[in-house]
Amino acid sequence: MEAAADGPAETRSRVEKDSRRAKKDSPAKTQSPAQDTSIMLRNNADTGKVPALPEHKKKRKGYLPAESVKILRDWMYKHRFRAYPSEAEKRMLSKKTNLSLSQISNWFINARRRILPDMLQRRGNDPIVGHKTGKDAHATHLRSTDASVPAKSGPRGSDNVQSLPLRSSPKGQMSGEKIPEPGSAPSQKLTVIAQPKKKVKVSNITSLSSPERVSTEEYADFSSFQLLVDAAVQRAAELELEKKQESNP
């Protein structure tokens, strides 16, 4: 009788143990789908793996559309000496590129350090301008162009002032002096030609202080007068030769 009583009790305990083991081995059969996902996330967190997101939820951070970048690069190339847009220009670029104002500002901040120096070096300009702000770079460019204008025009003005007295050497003729006759002495001719040079030096000093007041009428072309002087000198030399020949027959 005791063996018969022990038999059913043992079978019950065995069945309970088997059921407990089955529940432990297969927990997914008794749990909901939400619990399954939570268990998977916990397991991934424990192992250090990040669950893969669907493709339509993936976003590329830090990359702008190629068309928008092309528009911004074209604008920077046209305004490379003032390579930072104003607020109105930012709004205009925002409409064209469909980007926000902060995206445009960040792009220009990075592009002025990375893209603009190479762009200016290809054009043969100084890449240091690209590191300055828009207004400062534009002001420095204007100052450099303004400073280069008088530097170029200065020597030309002095050359013109120095070259003018050379053409106006016989200025004394306009003051009433007469052309030397062929029979006059050579010393007198030299004094006549030397006197305008002294006057020219005085006019040269005044013209350096105010070169714009020099009139073109005072410095007319006296090439015909030079021809007359040369002819007179030649005639005087011929007369002297004739006198020497007459004195020594």
From Swiss-Prot:
Residue ranges with Basic and acidic residues bias: 9-27
One Pfam family of this chain: Homeobox_KN
Bias (Polar residues) ranges: 28-46, 159-172
Ranges where the record places region Disordered: 1-62, 126-192
InterPro entries: HD (IPR001356), Homeodomain-like_sf (IPR009057), KN_HD (IPR008422), TALE_homeobox (IPR050224)
Compartments, as annotated in UniProt: Nucleus
Keyword Transcription regulation appears in the UniProt entry: yes
GO MF term set: DNA binding
Main localization category: nucleus
Gene Ontology BP annotations: regulation of DNA-templated transcription
Entry keyword set: DNA-binding, Homeobox, Nucleus, Transcription, Transcription regulation
Cellular component annotations (GO), alphabetically ordered: nucleus
Transmembrane domains' residue ranges: none
Record's keyword annotation contains Hydrolase: no
Residue ranges the UniProt entry marks as DNA-binding: 55-118
PANTHER family, per database record: HOMEOBOX PROTEIN TRANSCRIPTION FACTORS (PTHR11850)
Role: May have a transcription role in testis.
The family this protein is said to belong to: Belongs to the TALE/TGIF homeobox family.
Protein's name according to its UniProt entry: Homeobox protein TGIF2LX
Lineage, top ranks: Eukaryota, Metazoa, Chordata, Craniata, Vertebrata
